[in-house]
Amino acid sequence: MVAARGCTVIAHRGGAGEAPENTWTAVEHVAELGLTWMETDLRVSADGLVILSHDPDLMRTAADPRGIGELTWKELSELDAGDGRPPVRLDDALVAFPRLRFNIDLKESAVVQDALQVVRAADALERVRFASFSARRLAVLRRQEPRATTSLGVGDVLALVLHAEAGLRLPGTRWSWTKGRVDAVQVPACWGRVPVVTERFVAQAHRDGLEVHVWTVDEPEEMRRLAAMRVDGIVTDVPALALEVLGGQEPR
């Protein structure tokens, strides 16, 4: 593994700017680059199979308007996910790439239990990080599997921003990253016109034992700027370019 100045390159949807997103080609691309982490999204089929897909339907990737949750795996397996092959099942990806780590966005509540079952069956809890914009979804996951590693929930991200930038602690806020296995805060560099990732934010996150991962960063100058701020990870659609810009990747 080559060095990247301590900044991990995380392939967003498997590097959606360099391979068809969330496909076997994308997963293979991540592995061929020698990356440690792939970011992906999960949906569940009508018969409970966990599928790599950002969207709830297949219109954008397979020109099929049907929802993933409406289709059985048999029906899904007959479709082209964008690279001439069927959609990727999480269980198959975990088995086929035993050294690859997956940063998983739980796109719907229905997928939580099924995803946990798949990850447990593959004995892969140590190489999966769960994320979600839904605080409730993360809470359910943590209750069902206390050993699961997650990123910080949205409410706690706000609490961290206020604490870092203004020294404020929200009344009644539970600092969930001090309980359980929360290892990273994953945020955009800015929310609208408001900067999120600042030197104070990065420093506070590090004091709290959290890595800082920034999404979705595709411009070389922005990659360099964030790396200079000592962020720990850059989530990008162009991982090959990011490796070139940052000089490789540090093993994690």
Model-identified regions with their sequence ranges:
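Phosphate-group recognition and catalysis centered on beta-loop-alpha active-site segments
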Residues: 1-252
